[in-house]
Amino acid sequence: MQLVFASNNKNKILEIQSMLPESIKILSLSDIGCHEDIPETANTIEGNAILKANYVTQKYGYDCFADDTGLEVEVLNGQPGVFSARYAGEQRNDNDNMDKLLTELDDKTNRNAQFKTVICLNINNKQHLFTGIAKGNIVKNKIGNQGFGYDPIFQPEGYQYTFAQISLEEKANISHRGKATRALIDFFKN
């Protein structure tokens, strides 16, 4: 089965493809000729996932799934949240985003945070949502060089290392995206 993943983010595509059964082949947006930016104008993570999946299904006619992920920091009332990718500006620079967040948390003792991923699957004219959450905290300095996004500053609950210090396989077992993707996989098994 071929399924479009409404993304051109190579890191996300690799992470999700590594978790799916071999019988499901992921096509990226560029694989189907979609080169435009898909609007992410919703004010929730769920809303952005739905917008992206609906865009591909309606404009290109493919069954597809889309995800949106946000880092929600407790003391910042859930920010950066839906703005996580462009927290420090529209250029979407991971280091700038982390630096801005670390500066905002510099004098804070409460560094509790969670990553939230929502996957919206449009298949056979039906829509399904799958959510994954990874609780943890924001460390004071960037640690590790694996992963992407906020991985170097997010320490999952119960662990002594950041997401950027572990392998893709280990991260998939405990991450927000891993949990949401396993829910998606379970859907296909049933």
UniProtKB/Swiss-Prot annotation:
CC cofactor: Mg(2+)
Active-site positions on this chain: 68 (proton acceptor)
SUPFAM superfamilies associated with the record: ITPase-like (SSF52972)
Positions of Mg(2+) binding: 68
InterPro entries for this protein: dITP/XTP_pyrophosphatase (IPR020922), ITPase-like_fam (IPR029001), RdgB/HAM1 (IPR002637)
UniProt entry keywords in alphabetical sequence: Hydrolase, Magnesium, Metal-binding, Nucleotide metabolism, Nucleotide-binding
GO MF: dITP diphosphatase activity; ITP diphosphatase activity; metal ion binding; nucleotide binding; ribonucleoside triphosphate phosphatase activity; XTP diphosphatase activity
Gene Ontology biological process terms, A to Z: nucleotide metabolic process; purine nucleoside triphosphate catabolic process
EC supergroup of this enzyme: hydrolase
Cystine bridges: none
EC numbers, comma separated: 3.6.1.66
Record note on cofactor: Binds 1 Mg(2+) ion per subunit.
Subunit text: Homodimer.
Annotated family: Belongs to the HAM1 NTPase family.
Annotated function: Pyrophosphatase that catalyzes the hydrolysis of nucleoside triphosphates to their monophosphate derivatives, with a high preference for the non-canonical purine nucleotides XTP (xanthosine triphosphate), dITP (deoxyinosine triphosphate) and ITP. Seems to function as a house-cleaning enzyme that removes non-canonical purine nucleotides from the nucleotide pool, thus preventing their incorporation into DNA/RNA and avoiding chromosomal lesions.
The protein, known as: dITP/XTP pyrophosphatase
